[in-house]
A protein has these predicted regions:
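One-carbon transfer enzymes
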Residues: 1-262
Length: 262
């Protein structure tokens, strides 16, 4: 089973841990490392302002600032510990693994790189929507570990919005096969863990729904490769796209969570 990983430069849990994990049960033929130019950040900012308005975007920025001041230190400590533990479990990737550094996963260079390696499966751990010319290359499909339960919590922050909405049975990750839509492809599994919404941040919860389920995910990828995995039936369920987290919703969530413990 040949697998290729797409991830962002500096995303250590993906670039290091998931790469080692994939290599432990498959032939990790390549890694596409995305090094985005600053212009893409401003493009995302303009798109989000247009979508939710300038006032609500201040709410988004307020949470970013709050997180950096009050939460990021503890989360970075958790990530360092996770890296140490998982690097002890999973050995380094082979030196033969091909590496491509690119500003975008949708370039012609990336397409040529993936076609040359001819993976059976691509695991895309990136914020960028992939072109069909990219995600259609692997014979078994391109998959994402979506941070949210689909179809109810589509887009990049589904775990946060499920927590903020007190929809606690929908806090988890969906293994999706990419199609032409935004998180609309067939789901092959839901994954969660006994999260602590009082003491853990939404970022840690979003990471742990993946990291606590690596054994189960390994089994699922092997089923997908062998052709025995069937997509879940999600017909008739509500579908919604969610945006960036807000500070007001974060504070409401934590307040509800703490009251629930009393």
């Amino acid at each position: 089973m040949k697998i290729l990983l797409i991830c962002h430069d500096g995303a250590q849990l993906d670039q290091v841990i998931l790469a080692r994990w994939l290599s432990s049960f498959s032939n990790l033929v390549g890694i596409v490392i995305i090094q985005e130019p600053p212009s893409l950040l401003w493009r995302r900012v303009r798109r989000e302002v247009k979508r939710i308005g300038a006032f609500r975007f201040l709410d988004v920025l307020a949470l970013r600032l709050y997180y950096r001041i009050f939460l990021s230190g503890k989360d970075q400590q958790w990530e360092r510990q996770e890296l140490r533990e998982k690097c002890f479990i999973y050995g380094d990737i082979p030196s033969r693994t091909a590496i491509l550094e690119t500003p975008s996963p949708n370039t012609q260079e990336t397409e040529t790189f993936i076609r040359r390696l001819n993976p059976d499966i691509v695991l895309a751990r990136c914020k960028v929507l992939l072109k069909e010319s990219i995600f259609s290359i692997p014979s078994k499909g391109t998959f994402v570990m979506h941070p949210g339960i689909c179809p109810e919590y589509r887009n990049a922050h589904g775990c946060f919005w499920a927590l903020a909405n007190r929809d606690l049975t929908k806090v988890g990750m969906t293994l999706l096969r990419i199609d032409k839509g935004v998180d609309t492809g067939p789901a092959f599994g839901y994954y969660t863990y006994p999260f602590d919404e009082v003491h853990e941040s939404h970022i840690v919860i979003q990471h742990r729904v993946v990291m606590e389920n690596l054994d189960a995910l390994r089994s699922k990828f092997l089923e997908i490769f062998s052709g025995t995995a069937a997509p879940l039936n999600t017909s008739g369920r509500p579908s919604a796209v969610w945006g960036q987290p807000w500070l007001t919703k974060y504070l409401q969530w934590k307040s509800h969570a703490k009251r629930g413990r009393q």
